[in-house]
Swiss-Prot record:
GO terms for biological process: 'de novo' pyrimidine nucleobase biosynthetic process; 'de novo' UMP biosynthetic process. It comes from Rhodopseudomonas palustris (strain HaA2). Transmembrane segments: none annotated. Coiled coil: none annotated. Substrate binds at residues 17, 39, 66-75, 121, 182, 191, 211-212. This is Orotidine 5'-phosphate decarboxylase. Pathway: Pyrimidine metabolism; UMP biosynthesis via de novo pathway; UMP from orotate: step 2/2. Belongs to the OMP decarboxylase family. Type 1 subfamily. InterPro entries: Aldolase_TIM, OMPdecase, OMPdecase_AS, OMPdecase_bac, OMPdeCOase_dom, RibuloseP-bd_barrel.
Length: 235
């Protein structure tokens, strides 16, 4: 479960939220050696993007497969077993006990790390109430984090607003991956619980997931390099 301190460049994970493999490859070419870690989520994965994972790994990059698996234990386990062959560094599952246990058991000794998603960064207390939860965001995130730690997942995905609190619970070595990262002056978009890169690192995040501020920048490579520089200064 230990998480080594990654190089500054590899603490930035760029979300390849594009509709095609060709668009992803074009962005990867633009970013060059400024980015060493990419996230593939639903949009790209369902457009054939999982085939990019071994290609990126062969090119010396790391990949975060963000599928947020959640199903009965056997189904999750079989899915995880299939995904281990791709060579990804991270895979997400939702932080439900049965789902987490199945994923941890199925990944075996593959080296792929299981990250549990606590509460989506687009949710706030009102959203949880609408969904029927009795707990607010902070309490639900903490409860799920403690369950994940007991089950043996390798890391958590949480809002940067919860990073400092969770780092105190899980200790210094477990991965803590935070989306909802917006450099100063960037629009929040559909994220409700956001933070700048420097503040998120200072709060205890091990990795930052950044999409639109890089992908939609006039100069994506320059935008990525600026975030990496901010990460380095915040340590």
């Amino acid at each position: 479960m230990a998480q080594a301190d990654p190089a500054d460049r590899d603490r930035l994970i760029v979300a390849l939220d594009v509709p095609s493999v060709d668009a992803a490859k074009a962005m990867i070419d633009k970013l060059g050696d400024s980015v060493g870690f990419y996230k593939i989520g639903y949009q790209l994965a369902y457009a054939g993007g999982l085939a990019l994972v071994p290609q990126l790994v062969d090119a010396g990059k790391k990949v975060f497969v963000d599928l947020k698996l959640h199903d009965i234990g056997n189904t999750v386990a079989r899915g995880v077993e299939s995904l281990t062959a791709l060579g990804a560094t991270f895979l997400t599952v939702h932080a439900y006990p049965q789902t987490m246990r199945a994923a941890v058991e199925a990944r075996g000794t593959s080296g792929m790390k299981i990250l549990a998603v606590t509460v989506l960064t687009s949710y706030d207390d009102a959203d949880l109430t609408d969904a029927g939860y009795a707990l607010g965001v902070r309490d639900l995130v903490e409860a799920r984090a403690r369950q994940a730690l007991a089950i043996g997942v390798d890391g958590l995905v949480c809002s940067p607003e919860e990073a400092a609190h969770l780092r105190g619970i899980i200790g210094p070595r477990m991965a803590l991956v935070t989306p909802g990262i917006r450099p100063a002056g960037s629009a929040a978009g559909d994220q409700k619980r956001i933070m700048t890169p420097a503040r998120a690192i200072a709060a205890g995040a091990s990795h930052l997931v950044v999409g639109r501020p890089v992908m939609e920048a006039a100069d994506p490579k320059q935008a990525a390099e600026a975030i990496v520089a901010e990460i380095a200064q915040a340590k």
